[in-house]
Amino acid sequence: MNTHRLICATAIALALVGGGSSHAASQPSKYKGFTARVTNPWYPLKPGSVYVYRGVKDGQPSREVMTVTDRTRMIDGAPCVVVSDLLYLRGRLEERTTDYYTQDPRGRVWYFGEKTAELDRNGNIKNTSGSWLAGVRGAKPGIFMFTHPSPGQSARQEYYKGEAEDHFRVLRLDVPVKVPYGSFGHALMTKEWTPLEPGVIDHKFYVRGIGTVLERTAKGPLERNELVVPAGS
């Protein structure tokens, strides 16, 4: 995927969005008004912000460092903020990912792709599976966060057939959650799944003004990620 070049799309791909148990196509026909300045209170991406998470992945102690850069990139006609994500397992850098987010005029956060690379012990790229960019080879952007999430809302976060097909549904808005960074009484809880991993379900927890504070497996191999350093650090 690191050799992909952007192509111009003549029609904007549909993303499935809905409320209750149904999905509805609601992607705008154009990206007019989209901005790389992501200010959604449930997933703010202020340039310079750093989030550090610790947990368990693939049975190993993990550390993830997510940095919102001051860089932007046009993807399929939409201006996106560039976010760097580094995953360490047992202290060694295992995966390097660049994510692309944008916000529509209604305040919803959209996910427009990622460039991901698994690294070997020498730091060389051994796998780029899962990489995709909206508008390239049939890949479609998706909604990552609603402006005013409510239980039952659901969306497809990404679509690149066979590589990236994540979905999420809003479950609750009043969940108490405790992580190393602090305790919160009204977290947003979502359910995430993908048809590419049948039987695996994750729960994510978001706090207004911060973003993701906890991710854990609800069904499937144990994984957990907890916020230890807040945004702006």
Each predicted region: which residue ranges?
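Sec/Tat signal peptide C-region and signal peptidase I cleavage site
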Residues: 20-24
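Bacterial N-terminal signal peptides
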Residues: 9-18
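Bacterial N-terminal signal peptides that target proteins for export
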Residues: 1-9
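Conserved functional acidic sites
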Residues: 25-233
